Each structure stands twice: as structure tokens, then as C-alpha cells.
């Protein structure tokens, strides 16, 4: 009978205690009893606010980059899903805001980066915002850990092997295993990507599909038959000093 004990705990006391716990411990605490579950289920509570303000870079909190994640808890989750500084080309670095990659101006090189967390189960969506010039090739999509993150020349690195799947925003082509898989989206005179637009990437690990959405318009399924492997948000770029941000949103909303 934990509930009666929990009920005796002052709200402020719980708030202080939970503020000092690690995020993994908070997840365990939410399973202790209904009172603690409801307490932590408030994604804008002072507990999540405290963790958000103490873990997220101030640069990210001050910008409108996280406008699509409205609560402290979802902002925190997005941060832990952002680009990995340890899983990117040597010509790429992650900016102080934690969400934006910067490609250094290295000649005759194509460079890629993966997110910190990959997915093998469930449905997931994230936003990609290309905040600099696209250059001759700019690809967004997914890859396994086996996919290369750097190569010589200016090429569509993402989608160049059997471990990656990508959409080249410059030519509106789908790429996988080194082959052009068709035009995308399947529209007559499909508009080209404009720098700064937010594209939502939708990975469905249950149906094994990858889809995209732009300006809240579903563009259709891009890839089917994805493998039963852990798949990571990935981009590859060729333009010097270009920047790309990625914000994890969670489970996609149907409709």
C-alpha cells in the first residue's frame, strides 16, 4: 500500500526530491504508485522545468527551434535524441545549442551525421530544418550504424549503400543502395525544398515504412520493406558552412 504513504508527502517535498533524481530514476518513480505517476505525468511541472533548464543549452531554449515541442518534458526528450557529436563525419561538429550540425568548408568531401538514438520498434517522427544552402546534393533520411558518414567528392552519401535510405532535396529523388528509387513526392511539378522549411520524417517500425511531411501535408510513403534493424535519423551534406537542425517529436499524430 504505497498510495497512502505517497499521499502524505507534501507536493513541494516531492518536487524537491524529484528535481535531484536522474531522468532514468524519474521513469522508475512514475511506476511506483498512481500519485507519483500523475505527479510526473504533468509535462510542464516544475520538476520537468528544472531538469529542462538545467540540461538544455540556453541557446536552444531562447530560439524558436523547439517551437514544435511545447512542454518541458518533450523539449528534454528532443535534446537526448538530437545529433550525436560522436557519430558524425570529422568535418561536422554540433553547435552549442545541441540540435544543429555545422559542416566545415572542406573541399571534395561529403559528410553525414546520425542522431543519438535509433529505433527498431514503434512509430517515430522528427523535424529536419536545413538552415543553410543545399549545394548540389542534400539528403535526409535514415541509416543503420553500418552506413558510412564521410566519402570523397560531392555525392549522395545517404542512400549510396544498402544501409541507408534518403530523399535528395535538390533533385526530389529517393535513394537507396546506390540507385535512384524514383521521384518524390509523386506530384506534377513538385515544389523544391526552400531553406528553413521544416520537414517531418515519419518512421514506422511496425509497418517498416519511411514517409515525409512538409508544411503539414503528408507527402506519401517514400520507402517500404525497411529491415528489422535499429535505424537512426541521418542527413548528408556537401555545402561548406551549411547547417542542419533536427528535433525529435515523439509518436506521430494520425490524421
UniProtKB/Swiss-Prot annotation:
This protein's pathway: Protein modification; protein ubiquitination
Stretch forming the signal peptide: none
GO biological process terms on file: negative regulation of gene expression; negative regulation of synaptic assembly at neuromuscular junction; neuromuscular synaptic transmission; positive regulation of protein catabolic process; proteasome-mediated ubiquitin-dependent protein catabolic process; protein ubiquitination; synapse assembly involved in innervation
Pfam families given in the database record: F-box-like, SPRY
Major location category of this protein: other
Ribonucleoprotein found in the keyword field: no
Record-linked PROSITE patterns: B302_SPRY
Protein keywords: Neurogenesis, Synapse, Ubl conjugation pathway
Subunit structure: Component of an E3 ubiquitin ligase complex composed of hiw and Fsn.
Role played: Required in the presynaptic motoneuron to down-regulate the levels of wnd and restrain synaptic terminal growth at the neuromuscular junction (NMJ).
Record's protein name: F-box/SPRY domain-containing protein 1
